[in-house]
């Protein structure tokens, strides 16, 4: 039987609010499967040794949130299965060789192409390592491609199989007793099968866009030691205010583009570019109207 996971107060203090919420729910031992949605394609702040770093979500999960786990695996339909450390990959390879020997398969030469086949192997591996009291985290990115939204009757066989495995994990008391976490990442929760989203054993955590203070912190980090090109009429404060609704990566691109190309970063340019970015993010479903009372 696995040991009871306990939180580290110092560790949690350096995490953003949504990550602390995930940790609190996990440490309650009532939830082992989470859906991360919203601003999942952005940089995430983490404070370590008094310094704030901004990491892509995948790296944040591997290093900050699940950095103390024995095994951290990430799967997505296009990229396949990856591991946070080579030792973890070697451990999986050994387990896979044992699976092949027992079942007469040859998955060591190549994993199944279909997600349900991969999830079935992961199910076997997770159970094996949970029995060894290993601390495990599994991240499934672009989860909407593994268990897409839709009526069960219209789902393909592989999608139904994947959905059943995910539901089985959410129902499994062994996962709750063990130190195991499964995170499904889907930018738009509505694109993920509602049988998972609404499952009582699954918690949805929305990652918000940065607020004005968070944007200001990030902008100041980006501008540290550099000067905006001549003709720029924004300060860090006005940039943080006018950047409402933008991701950190979008702000980073705006600043980097201006500096590298020696182009002035102006309020007019920022307003126009912000309009284009927000409308593009919405897939043309929104028309952004710039208020004349912004400042």
At which residue positions do the language-model features occur?
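Switch/connector loops and helix/strand junctions flanking conserved nucleotide-binding motifs
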Residues: 44, 147-148, 190-196, 213-217
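Sensor-1/coupling segment of RecA-like P-loop NTPase cores
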Residues: 159-194, 212
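Helical mechanochemical/support elements of P-loop NTPase systems and associated helical scaffolds
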Residues: 53, 57, 114-121, 135, ...
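Extended hydrophobic secondary-structure segments that form protein cores and membrane-embedded regions
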Residues: 34-36, 138-141, 181-186, 239-243
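Short, ordered loop/turn segments at secondary-structure junctions
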Residues: 143, 187-188, 210, 270
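Short, well-ordered amphipathic alpha-helices
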Residues: 58, 122-123, 163-171, 220-224
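AAA+ P-loop ATPase motor domain of ring mechanoenzymes
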Residues: 1-22, 31-37, 79-96, 196-295
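Extended, compositionally biased accessory segments flanking or bridging domains
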Residues: 1-157
């Amino acid at each position: 039987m696995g040991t009871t996971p306990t939180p580290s107060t110092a560790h949690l203090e350096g995490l953003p609010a949504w990550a602390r919420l995930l940790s609190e729910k996990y440490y309650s031992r009532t939830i082992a499967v989470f859906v991360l949605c919203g601003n999942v394609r952005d940089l995430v702040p983490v404070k370590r040794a008094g310094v704030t770093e901004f990491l892509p979500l995948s790296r944040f999960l591997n290093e900050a949130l699940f950095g103390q786990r024995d095994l951290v695996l990430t799967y997505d339909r296009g990229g396949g299965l990856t591991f946070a450390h080579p030792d973890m990959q070697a451990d999986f390879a050994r387990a896979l060789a044992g699976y092949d020997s027992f079942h007469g398969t040859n998955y060591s030469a190549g994993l199944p192409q279909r997600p349900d086949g991969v999830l079935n192997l992961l199910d076997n591996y997770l159970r094996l390592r949970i029995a060894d009291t290993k601390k495990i985290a599994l991240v499934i990115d672009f989860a909407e491609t593994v268990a897409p939204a839709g009526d069960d009757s219209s789902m393909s066989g592989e999608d139904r199989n994947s959905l059943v495995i995910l539901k089985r994990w959410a129902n499994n008391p062994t996962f709750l007793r063990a130190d195991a976490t499964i995170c499904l990442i889907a930018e738009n929760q509505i694109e993920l099968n509602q049988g998972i989203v609404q499952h009582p054993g699954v918690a949805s955590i929305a990652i918000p866009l940065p607020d004005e203070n968070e944007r200001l912190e990030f902008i100041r980090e980006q501008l540290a030691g550099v000067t905006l090109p001549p003709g720029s009429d924004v300060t860090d404060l006005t940039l943080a205010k006018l950047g409402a609704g933008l991701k950190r990566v979008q702000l980073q691109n705006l600043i980097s583009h201006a500096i590298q190309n020696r182009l002035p970063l102006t309020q007019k340019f920022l307003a126009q570019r912000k309009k284009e970015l927000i409308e593009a993010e919405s897939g043309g479903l929104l028309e952004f109207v710039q208020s004349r009372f912004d400042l």
